[in-house]
Amino acid sequence: MYLVITKSYPPEVGGMQNLMWGLTNSLSKYFMIKVFADYQDQHQNYDKEVSFSIERIGGIKLLRKYRKAHLVNEFIKNNKNIEGIISDHWKSLELIKTNKKKICLIHSKEINHNEGTSLNKRVLNILNNVDHVISNSEYTKNLAINCGVNSSKITVINPGVNPAKELNKKTIKEAENLLKNKSPRLITVSRLDKRKNHEKIIMALRNLKQTYPNIIYTCIGDGDEEENLKQLVKELGLDEQVLFLKKISQDLKNTLVAKSNIFVMPSIFYKKSVEGFGIAFIEAAQYGIPSIGGKDGGAADAIEHQKNGLICDGNSLDEIYSSINDLLNDKKYLEYGKIAKENSTKFYWDKIIEKYKKILN
């Protein structure tokens, strides 16, 4: 049996949550799995779907880490068939007392602390004493090595996706009503925060509008930058070109992606935060939609430059504008989109899980 300790798990929404849900579901086909996850409202809707055990830990957030560690330690003490522990975050392993095999996933931001600081020392104390460190991209692997993690412990395994669901007629109609026959169509699905760089996409849109007066940019997500971005759209007179949506169904989100031409997310460094991988690029690729990503972070693991999309400098407005214009010119996005769709299958969970099996076996 393998124990999975996670801070990020459905029904909470996000890339990390999707990763841990996909990983545990896929692992359970080959191993006995027990998950220790944070309590979430309506978790029963998810927990009843699976064949493995999920233990939810509630209470005050500050004390939850200690309660979870106590439960895990007690479970290990009372069960002799534990083969190892898989954790989504180094902090989840700090209080675990066992000699069993330990595997820790790393994503980028959570390990990015200056050398010699107390946080850096805590990170290294955990990661250099586990059996395996799983990095979500080559970028994150190099970041970990630069932070002092032993390179021999690190294996790169990109996050997986499940095959895309077929679109249904009802949501296709709903999406087309929202898009109002406008074209070309750009889209971003992410939190609205500084790192995702929506601001520069909107600024590039002002120039693109001169060539493509019917262009539309759909922003799906919410976050701290929402009001600032809406104000920018108003100031630039782009109300007819930008569509903000949040808290929509997964089906509608997928349909809006599938009915777009280019997925745009040229992420940048912001403080300590950086894009570790970018699973949203793969989710778009499944529908034949090419992506434009930023050179900062791990987007290059998902986007092959000038094959299934473009990598640009997210700090350069000119590069973002040129990249979008390049893909729209002669509808080059169709050619890149075809390659993106073919390439996306290598990220299916049934292939990704084989890499985990090699480590666990």
Question: Model-predicted segments: where are they?
Answer:
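N-terminal strand-loop element at the rim of the active site
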Residues: 6-13, 19-64
